[in-house]
């Protein structure tokens, strides 16, 4: 709907003209500080004529979006004060970082965190100088920025972060600015459907503010060129009621924006009151949103060098580029900055004048001081059941079969039960919770769903702890927003398709890396991934579903941020899941299978093994006590572990005098040197496991080069021979998948024979028998369409003799 100047407004927070005049001055102050950050080294209040030496040598920053962000921030302040609201500001166009810094400085929250940036002339000088400057602060709404949970550097995730923040925060309103450039991204386009998962009875609200300034870096935006009627139809289709605020006259725009926000917050209040009156079922509401059309680079130079700037893409970054070298440009900049009348905004000391300071909310109501933007302040410890009570009984290694993720599902079911009252734990997944065998969680909760529910639907409810949507972007974004505001969660996904959020993982890892060096940023719960339906058991879906490379990306990140785990069975998975849910400020990646598989370790043995992260399985090897093996058979991952033990079984029977050591790796980062990762083994401990000179046949779940990379500086790296996924795949049998990649028991046993000095000649007949088995396998699967009985029915025989 259009919100006009003449509309009747009886809301509590209706703004008088005098209030709007003050608000305009506040907005001008924010704009002035934003320009100053981009351009000035000195002379922050223009108390002397602007000279070239006052200008930064490198002009960095983005002006175009910033005046719109400042306009929104100032108006939200008015409504927060009038209605005592709890509002979190998510700045989608994070490149408008000068505006976020300016507003938190004006309200005082910035100087409270950074007392060296005082609220006076010297503080202003430091504020300006530090922006996008060596040793200073970044150009975006980075973790260094008070009030930010969203950097907005890589575009696409603002709205989904906002919804994640609103979940289970019934008193919170998340005002989310969506730039019209960001609105063109895939994740943002999908994010509009998040309102189908927001329950107004238990969750907070999200107020999207679509900022149509019409341009990106050098092109118009799609939404910016659409008509109001098209915009209205589009967003009504998404379930919103658009409120249009359009124009370029500040005086008129202040009135229209004030009215629009009054209507929007009244609508939110009405929706929530209706939902919270005790009714059992709620009809999905039509939530309000603001559509703000304002010029890009609003209030800046209209032209520079005879070329259009305001209202065009030339305003995107630095509209006046050569102020040091070009006196005409310097004059344009000075006129521009003086147009804000800084002498009427700041007092003699350089502080914001009292009547403008009074416009900011107080205490934690200031958006820069909202504790939800520093979620560690609000984080409560997750209540966890005793993982040992879910143990699979394993009387002997390999004696029983189990489904690792099914056991994990029972553990997660009880995590949900124990934290039901706190409402601070959610499971996200792209329609895969049941497929990944975690469906025990549905014994205690449902999938949240605000769309109509049919009588024949299964495990759908308006209140649930499981969120499923066929968008890995939304699952990741909801979880990030949830974690950043102080809660806990778990993301289960097919291994191959977690690549869809590679870049989101990157950005979250960068955020965590920076927060490690900001003492005021309290630790948040870790982001926990379960990657299952993995490469070795996607034989039914084929090559498109077979990719274990996500962990390669994870391993690139800072060692104090990432962990990678390959539990070989259910009990190790339970220990690791419990451990990961207790950690903070990390990203934990767990790769585990869901199919029936041999169970190797009792819970006590699993706990001992996982606590170290790597170890010798003495029960599997044949080496003499106190001696060195002839060969080390190492493994990481459930299927590589199975194939390694099957290979050891073949070798034990065929070559009983061969001394074999079996090493299993659960925590992949133990392979790195101790000085590169806190979990890394010392060289001495590494050599004690892998020897200094004996051949090591390493069966690895993923791409082999990662193991070589992690162990590059180890003594015996030259003796390390890694087999893993070789990018061979199709729709075939489970065992044929490992054969195609030469990770099967026969290839592993053959390589062991070839690598032990002198053994290849002595065991030539054994090697030929193993090769014959590979030919037999190939013929059998192509004739029968399933693996040979000796493969399907193989069990670990226990100790020889």
UniProtKB/Swiss-Prot annotation:
What processes does the entry annotate via GO biological process terms? carbohydrate metabolic process
Q: Which UniProt keywords apply?
A: Lyase, Thiamine pyrophosphate
Please list the disulfide bridges: none
Name the coenzymes or cofactors required: thiamine diphosphate
Taxonomy, superkingdom: Bacteria
Molecular function per GO: aldehyde-lyase activity
- E.C. numbers: 4.1.2.-
Q: Which SUPFAM superfamilies match?
A: Thiamin diphosphate-binding fold (THDP-binding)
Q: What family does this chain come from, according to its entry?
A: Belongs to the XFP family.
Name of the protein this chain belongs to:
Probable phosphoketolase
Q: What's the source species' lineage? A: Bacteria, Pseudomonadati, Pseudomonadota, Alphaproteobacteria, Hyphomicrobiales
């Amino acid at each position: 709907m259009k919100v006009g100047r003449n509309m009747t407004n009886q809301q509590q927070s209706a703004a008088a003209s005098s209030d709007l005049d003050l608000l305009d001055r506040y907005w001008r102050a924010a704009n002035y500080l934003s320009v100053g950050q981009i351009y000035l080294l000195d002379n922050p209040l223009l108390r002397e004529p602007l000279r070239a030496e006052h200008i930064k040598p490198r002009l960095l920053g983005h002006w175009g979006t910033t005046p719109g962000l400042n306009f929104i921030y100032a108006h939200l302040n008015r409504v927060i004060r009038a209605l005592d609201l709890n509002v979190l500001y998510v700045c989608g166009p994070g490149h408008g970082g000068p505006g976020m810094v300016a507003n938190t400085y004006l309200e005082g929250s910035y100087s409270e965190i950074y007392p060296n940036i005082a609220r006076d002339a010297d503080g202003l000088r430091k504020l300006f100088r530090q922006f996008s400057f060596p040793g200073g602060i970044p150009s975006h709404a980075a973790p260094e920025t008070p009030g930010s949970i969203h950097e907005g550097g890589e575009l696409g995730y603002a709205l989904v972060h906002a919804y994640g923040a609103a979940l289970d925060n019934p008193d919170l309103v998340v005002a989310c600015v969506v730039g019209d450039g960001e609105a063109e991204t895939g994740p943002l386009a999908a994010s509009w459907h998040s309102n189908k998962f927001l329950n107004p009875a238990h969750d907070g609200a999200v107020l999207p503010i679509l900022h149509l300034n019409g341009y990106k870096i050098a092109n118009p935006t799609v939404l910016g060129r659409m008509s109001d009627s098209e915009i209205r139809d589009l967003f009504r289709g998404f379930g919103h009621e658009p409120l249009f605020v359009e124009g370029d006259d500040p005086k008129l725009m202040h009135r229209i924006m004030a009215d629009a926000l009054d209507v929007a917050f009244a609508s939110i209040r009405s929706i929530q009151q209706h939902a919270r009156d005790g009714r059992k079922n709620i009809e999905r509401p039509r939530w309000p949103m603001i559509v703000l059309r304002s010029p890009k680079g609003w209030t800046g130079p209209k032209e520079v060098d005879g070329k259009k700037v305001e209202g065009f893409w030339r305003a995107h970054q630095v509209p006046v580029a050569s102020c040091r070298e070009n006196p005409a440009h310097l004059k344009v900049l000075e006129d521009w900055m003086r147009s804000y009348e800084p002498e009427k905004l700041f007092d003699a000391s350089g502080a914001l004048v009292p009547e403008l300071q009074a416009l900011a909310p107080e205490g934690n109501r200031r958006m820069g001081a909202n504790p939800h933007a520093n979620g560690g302040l609000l984080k409560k410890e997750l209540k966890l059941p005793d993982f040992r009570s879910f143990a699979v009984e394993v009387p002997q290694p390999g004696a029983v079969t189990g489904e690792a993720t099914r056991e994990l599902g029972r553990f997660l079911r009880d995590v949900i039960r124990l934290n039901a009252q706190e409402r601070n734990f959610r499971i996200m997944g792209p329609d895969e919770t049941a497929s990944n065998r975690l469906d025990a969680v549905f014994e205690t909760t449902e999938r949240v769903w605000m769309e109509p529910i049919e009588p024949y639907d299964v495990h759908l409810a308006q209140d649930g702890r499981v969120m499923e949507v066929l968008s890995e972007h939304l699952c990741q974004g909801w979880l990030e927003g949830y974690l950043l505001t102080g809660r806990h969660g778990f993301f289960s996904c097919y291994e191959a398709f977690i690549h869809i959020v590679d870049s989101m993982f990157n950005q979250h890892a960068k955020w965590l890396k920076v927060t490690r060096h900001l003492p005021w940023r309290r630790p948040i719960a870790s982001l926990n991934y379960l990657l299952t339906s993995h490469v070795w058991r996607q034989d039914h879906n084929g090559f498109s579903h077979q990719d274990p490379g996500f962990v390669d990306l994870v391993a690139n990140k800072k060692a104090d941020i990432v962990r990678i785990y390959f539990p070989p069975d259910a009990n190790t998975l339970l220990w690791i899941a419990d451990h990961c849910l207790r950690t903070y400020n990390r990203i934990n990646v767990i790769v585990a299978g869901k199919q029936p598989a041999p169970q190797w370790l009792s819970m006590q043995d699993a706990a001992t093994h996982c606590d170290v992260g790597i170890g010798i399985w003495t029960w599997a090897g044949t080496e003499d006590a106190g001696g060195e093996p002839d060969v080390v058979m190492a493994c990481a991952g459930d299927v590589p572990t199975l194939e390694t033990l099957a290979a050891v079984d073949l070798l034990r029977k065929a070559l009983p005098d061969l001394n074999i050591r079996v090493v299993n790796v659960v925590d992949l980062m133990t392979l790195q040197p101790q000085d590169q990762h806190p979990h890394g083994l010392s060289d001495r401990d590494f050599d004690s496991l892998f020897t200094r000179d004996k051949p090591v046949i390493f069966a690895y779940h993923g791409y082999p080069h990662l193991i070589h990379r992690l162990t590059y500086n180890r003594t015996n790296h030259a003796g390390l021979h890694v087999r893993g996924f070789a990018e061979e795949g199709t729709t075939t049998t489970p065992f044929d998948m490992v054969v195609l990649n030469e990770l099967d028991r026969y290839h592993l046993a053959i390589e062991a024979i070839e690598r032990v000095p002198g053994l290849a000649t002595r065991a030539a007949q054994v090697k030929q028998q193993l090769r014959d088995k590979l030919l037999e396998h190939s013929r059998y699967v192509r004739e029968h369409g399933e693996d040979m009985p000796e493969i399907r029915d193989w069990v670990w025989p226990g100790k020889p003799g």
